[in-house]
């Protein structure tokens, strides 16, 4: 670990999968480990927030995912990989994970008539069901 790395990072700079992390914090770390394109966002988040705040981080993840879906940011993490990862995590039915995915990802997806709303049709079956519960009108 170098002085400029977050305290929860491994020698290669990736977030450490700590057995003591709460499910919501572990979700963030697992996302960054699975999709390294989120590393810069993660590092900035940890620096600005002085730690990991999963709901705050996932608001940014939602924005990046929609930008990628719309093709507006070639450097944004691939939206398909993000949705696939979140679908897998949602299928685990872990309360701390579900709370973050539903509250800070699904609820912040664009509303009908807004650019990017079509991403809702790309959700896997688990997230689509959760989305329908929290936003029945789309």
PLM regions and their residue ranges:
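Polar/charged alpha-helical tracts
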Residues: 13, 26, 30-33, 121, ...
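Alpha-helical solenoid scaffolds in large eukaryotic transport, assembly, and signaling factors
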Residues: 19-83, 102-111, 115-120
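Amphipathic alpha-helical binding modules
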Residues: 95-138
């Amino acid at each position: 670990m170098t002085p400029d790395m977050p305290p929860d990072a491994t020698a290669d700079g990736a977030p450490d999968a700590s057995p003591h992390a709460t499910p919501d914090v572990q979700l963030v770390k697992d996302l960054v480990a699975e999709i390294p394109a989120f590393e810069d966002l993660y590092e900035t988040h940890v620096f600005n927030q002085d730690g990991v705040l999963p709901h705050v981080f996932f608001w940014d993840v939602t924005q990046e995912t929609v930008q990628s879906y719309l093709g507006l940011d070639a450097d944004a993490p691939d939206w398909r990989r993000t949705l696939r990862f979140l679908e897998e995590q949602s299928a685990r039915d872990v309360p701390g994970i579900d709370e973050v995915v539903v509250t800070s990802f699904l609820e912040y997806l664009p509303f009908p008539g807004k650019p990017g709303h079509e991403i809702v049709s790309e959700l896997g079956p688990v997230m689509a069901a959760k989305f329908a519960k929290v936003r029945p009108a789309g």
